[in-house]
Swiss-Prot record:
It comes from Saccharomyces cerevisiae (strain ATCC 204508 / S288c). Residues 19-193 form the FAD-binding PCMH-type domain. This is D-arabinono-1,4-lactone oxidase. It comes from the Eukaryota. It catalyses: D-arabinono-1,4-lactone + O2 = dehydro-D-arabinono-1,4-lactone + H2O2 + H(+).
Amino acid sequence: MSTIPFRKNYVFKNWAGIYSAKPERYFQPSSIDEVVELVKSARLAEKSLVTVGSGHSPSNMCVTDEWLVNLDRLDKVQKFVEYPELHYADVTVDAGMRLYQLNEFLGAKGYSIQNLGSISEQSVAGIISTGSHGSSPYHGLISSQYVNLTIVNGKGELKFLDAENDPEVFKAALLSVGKIGIIVSATIRVVPGFNIKSTQEVITFENLLKQWDTLWTSSEFIRVWWYPYTRKCVLWRGNKTTDAQNGPAKSWWGTKLGRFFYETLLWISTKIYAPLTPFVEKFVFNRQYGKLEKSSTGDVNVTDSISGFNMDCLFSQFVDEWGCPMDNGLEVLRSLDHSIAQAAINKEFYVHVPMEVRCSNTTLPSEPLDTSKRTNTSPGPVYGNVCRPFLDNTPSHCRFAPLENVTNSQLTLYINATIYRPFGCNTPIHKWFTLFENTMMVAGGKPHWAKNFLGSTTLAAGPVKKDTDYDDFEMRGMALKVEEWYGEDLKKFRKIRKEQDPDNVFLANKQWAIINGIIDPSELSD
């Protein structure tokens, strides 16, 4: 049995507050050796392990009543090596380090992470384990910046993985949903520090559609916040710069009063009278951005790169994010726009805002690109690896093109359907999320692994309940679609999972893995 100290009666709750767990034991190992010991002990005791970091996944994928492991004490920098002639550096860190801690270290060295998502609270291991991404026509999954990984597999073996050492296991571990092993260290490729110069425009929804074919490749970093009842969008575009910082844009809901007022309005519209929702959106939009359409000559801000990448996620929320081919984006947005409007007319359901619309380019060259002529503000990635993870949910048919030739045909469109939980109160999501998922599915989309996708009883595997026996927000599962979508890649992932974890040490919360096709029910002896 493990000699590592543990806590009993610990309650884990995810950031959104939707799910909680009271594990039998809660561990915080302080070294890689302790992680190895812990996995071996769990195997001998026939216990399962789940690793958690910041708990930002809004789903129940990390819920367990057995052993829970947190790597926050594995937060040291192991090595930092600069390659000035190639204009990058490689930093090797413990996998429990949070991104904001890594950002602080890199900033002091004059370097930056190349691309990030909307927050920096995740751990180095956690951010790649479910396929996290930023929003750029040139950059792909965050994992493409990782040069190598060291994991402890289910046999308690320490394994070093990269494109040359166990490349197939590497491709499984780059997006593992926690089922291949515990990532204990990683090497990340970083670039000389840069600021982001951004413009923020208010445009109509119709103008967004008119600009669709050229808009997404107009800046290195780009995202849209869609307000369907207001029929307006906020278009944010950013590029690297060495200009001096002048701070972020002002935010009404970034103030204590604005934030409280918005959450109160959401509570009233969800708990007392739902048809108020469109009016709440219009009021909040006008307070945050004003009534008039603004051009790109309006709000211009220069911030550090991390402030440019990150955004205020506001309140506890259900999030259902899917990615589909950008070429299908016009059809998707028109369909969703019509459905949202009709649902409001019929008082069937209402959506919350902003709906975040983003893109990525997960196409990969056959080999790493020449970086010898880059500058601090050169666009595009310096790849840590050119391996596509087996469980990458982005379109697999897109083909790599040099930056100057990138079009929508290389891109993945991401849409976030977000429903807030004002003051921690659950809000109905099933009607809206089901329609959203069906729309994205028809357009060739797949869900983000960490989010609150629902699926259906007809798509799940293993035992299912009657539809009426599920909670409104309860996941039904997507196993049959997952098998169809991922095909041979899923078969390879399952084979590697079984080889690396023959005793199912990392199969806590088996139900989540079964209903979503990560494992075949026949793999389990029980």
